[in-house]
Amino acid sequence: MMRIALFLLTNLAVMFVFGIILSLTGIQGRSVQGLMIMAGLFGFGGAFVSLLMSKWMALRSVGGQVIENPTSEVERWLLDTVRRQSEQVGIKMPQVAIYDAPDINAFATGARRDASLVAVSTGLLASMSRDEAEAVIAHEISHVANGDMVTMTLLQGVVNTFVIFISRIIAQFVANFISSDEESENSNGNPWVYMGVSMVLEIVFGILASIITMWFSRYREFHADAGSAKLVGREKMIAALQRLKTSYEPQEESSMMAFCINGRNKSFSELFLSHPPLDKRIEALRSGEYLK
């Protein structure tokens, strides 16, 4: 709760400063205030709705089945492993699901630490040893224990808010600059220019802003790897990452990649990857950089 309050206060403070600066430049105060409210509602609203629906959407997108009553030795082992690790980190046991996919992968999601979901692919259970699978599960449990889902949502909300706010402000300047006298009576100038410029800028700034969220996602992956190493041992986590190097390209939806153990490696720039390269993750574990 404190984390949410700090993020919201920081966002409001920065937006307040922006409002003062823009008011000094001559933009109508009511226009700025309304835009700040609208940007905040849309920016945070979309992020939080996605978070609240994350378990349902994740299960639906991969066709996952929550294990209610285990029917096999593998399912019993999976539940026992998640239960034991949850107790170790002090969280309520997440729901556990299995989904049919050939790639070696797993993910965690949920709106709260004590109302989360951990899902693993059939490819992971078939291809990994128990030690390797245990390390992957510990990685996902670490995501839950660290509150990474909520933190990523808050960061996305802040980023969304600023993308909307700054895009609309610049669009307002441009529209007013090229508008006729009659159109200038409208606080946003020419409405077609305003909407066109704001849409283009939101796309451009959205792409640039994703660099921030992807950097944070990569940073949290190192910490989740370290959390797994603390739970089950460094060598098990290294072995799991080495196994991932031989796996299929992940098939999960892009929106879920941030909390999968295995991310996509095909990108024209590492800046837009949700996961660090596997070799860097292995090296970080060996050096103990995030284990301190």
From Swiss-Prot:
Record-annotated membrane-spanning stretches: 4-24, 34-54, 158-178, 192-212
GO biological process: proteolysis
Subcellular compartments: Cell inner membrane
Cofactor binding notes: Binds 1 zinc ion per subunit.
UniProt GO molecular function: metalloendopeptidase activity; zinc ion binding
Cofactor: Zn(2+)
Binding-site residues, Zn(2+): H139, H143, E221
UniProt topology in membrane: Multi-pass membrane protein
Keywords from the named record: Cell inner membrane, Cell membrane, Hydrolase, Membrane, Metal-binding, Metalloprotease, Protease, Stress response, Transmembrane, Transmembrane helix, Zinc
EC number in record: 3.4.24.-
GO cellular component terms, A-Z: plasma membrane
Active site residues according to the UniProt entry: E140
Primary residence: membrane
Domain of life: Bacteria
InterPro entries listed in its UniProt record: HtpX_protease, Pept_M48_protease_HtpX, Peptidase_M48
Family: Belongs to the peptidase M48B family.
Protein name per its UniProtKB record: Protease HtpX
Organism: Proteus mirabilis (strain HI4320)
